[in-house]
Amino acid sequence: MSKIPGSNLEFVREEDFVEYYIFPKIPDNVQDEGALRKLMLQIRNEISAIVREKSLERSYLWHKDEFQLQVRLGGAEERLLNEETNPEEEAELGDLPPHFHGVTHYGDNISDEWFVVYLLTEITRARGDCIARVSDSDGEFLLIEAADALPDWASPETCEQRVYLVGGHLQLLQNSAASSQDKPLTMAMAVQRIRMNPTLYRCSQEIQSCIDARLKEYQIAQPHFSIHRQVLELPHSAAQLLKQKPRLLSSAVRAFCERDSLDIKALRTMRYFPPEATRVRTNVRFTRCLYAMLSHQQYLPEKRLGWHLTDPVSEPERYKEQLLGLKLASGLEILATQAKRVEGQQLEDLPAWRSYLRSLLSKGYFRDNIEGSAEYQELLNKAKVYFRGNQERFRTASRAGAEILDLLLHPAEAASEELRDEENNLQPSDSDEWLNISAEDLDSMLQDRYGPKKLYKPNGQMNAEEFTKQLAEFLDRQSNYEGIEHRGLEEPELDSDDDEPPPQANGSTGLTAKVKKNPSMRKACQRNSVIQPEEPDSTHVRNFLDFVIPEDNWDSTSEMSDYADEDDMESNLNALSGGGSVFPLDRQIQSYMEQMDRELAQTSVGKSFHGKKKTAPQADEDDFDDIEDFEPININVNTLRNMMDSYQSQVGGAGPVSNLFSAMGVGMSAVEDKEQKDISESAV
């Protein structure tokens, strides 16, 4: 598992986690640690009330871990216990101010990650003094969501630890062009900058709209659309337990879906949840993710245990209720068995504790104290308390199993009464047709989310001007190991990082720390360190698109339009010659080109170009009857027409134009391939 600066409890972390920080504003007069902790606990209670309200309004079910916050005062010993730093990383991360920290594992349900973002947005909106930061195993995933709207300077390297939520809005602290790429901005420095000017770093509306669109499903104060209600037939003890602790449902489903050979052995006896002669029917709320996981698990119980199922053909709905019920009861059985297996295990026997202790030793937590001394033992006891407390933060299988065993020993009579009342007033199960999706629906969803840009206006005509603009922008880019980049664009003047050193006079910041640590990538970068000059083909196409169209000079002897001034002519000739350095053009060649213009003007080649619309003649144009048929060439329309003709000649197959369209992010549907679109001046 890769180390992330500022990460928490690395030894229990999986890849599917989201990590978040909340920095409240602490008054200057609160200096005492006891008073500070009391204030932090009070603020946490207020934040927890907001989270509870939003979760209940939406009847939200967590897939694995819930949203939770731990108080962090930012002390050095606390950070060592929390596995946040190595001694050599202290200068990089800086001293964090008092804050709340949380980690939520979302498993297979990505909705939990975005619900965390929604909660942080609402918390910072309700409490304007709070600044929040959120990231996951991919880093700044909020910027990944808004990738199409980011400024040119934004990249994973330049934006590390620079994305924050303030007042319900996304803020991105810009990096200085003179800053070091190997040293990310510390969170303490970022929070300080935002405090100084809370609105300076607010993202553009386009970026904010990308995030708001992703959070739209959570903003309605009603049960979330992902909730699926299903009637199940369960053993009475299992149904009673789920009424007492509905959150055990997700642990049971995951345990059943992830069962191993030891778990299957436990299912052959069903010691804790035997299939009783009379089972109860009850309403159970799933998330769609959990329901899909449970439904698609292939499992048939042993009949000798007493799992009698109805005929799936004659009573399919009743069969589904029974089959899903026995799967869920089996998951609860697995959890109880796992907890019983480790019930008497000592802390020193846990692999996680041994790994945690080794980590503390390597980071100098015990200082120079001799093992067994009073100081050493005091620090060791602190570490044990801290370890146990943090283990209880997460919904591990053993913790859920221990909770099940405790509830079986102390059943609640109120839950039994609720079951009896509910059995006479069962709500019907929700339709699960959403499980079935056709290929056409999937294609439509992918097209809406990731589909290429269209060239058509709402009236069905093609936008020639937009097409040539996209083509010119695409050709004006260069490629290296990081992908296609804009060429020739100067970096904007950005805020300076006071804590970051200036660059070397002749240094380059192109190689990031990740590249330096990766030998294969470093070699690839060295091979590509010299950027090759542009290909002649792309240069010529760009020059054609940028060609200056002069005003007509009616006094010219040429039969086609001449150049209105000498500067335009020189710029066009230099453009076609590559700047005059590769193919120098003298006056004799220029005269040849002018003669060719005159000869081609009245030929089929000259007439094949699409011209611009003629405007009504003015009073002072009566003397130009001899050139009334002249139409200036429309570069945009002619470029698009030629590209479309070439595309149609490929009959939808691979070829130069379709490959260019794909690289530009431009798509042509099958229907559009067959129809002849109106490519005219009105389309521009």
Swiss-Prot record:
Renumbered residue ranges of the record's region Disordered: 491-528, 603-624
Pfam families in UniProt: SGT1
Consequence recorded when altering residue 656 to S: Temperature-sensitive mutation; disrupts production of the steroid hormone ecdysone, causes developmental and reproductive defects
Tissue specificity note: Expressed in the ecdysone-producing larval ring gland, nervous system, imaginal disks and gonads.
GO terms for MF: snRNP binding
PANTHER family on file: PROTEIN ECDYSONELESS HOMOLOG (PTHR13060:SF0), SGT1 PROTEIN HSGT1 SUPPRESSOR OF GCR2 (PTHR13060)
Function: Required in both the follicle cells and the germline for oocyte development.
Protein name in the entry: Protein ecdysoneless
Organism per entry: Drosophila melanogaster (Fruit fly)
Upper classification of the organism: Eukaryota, Metazoa, Ecdysozoa, Arthropoda, Hexapoda
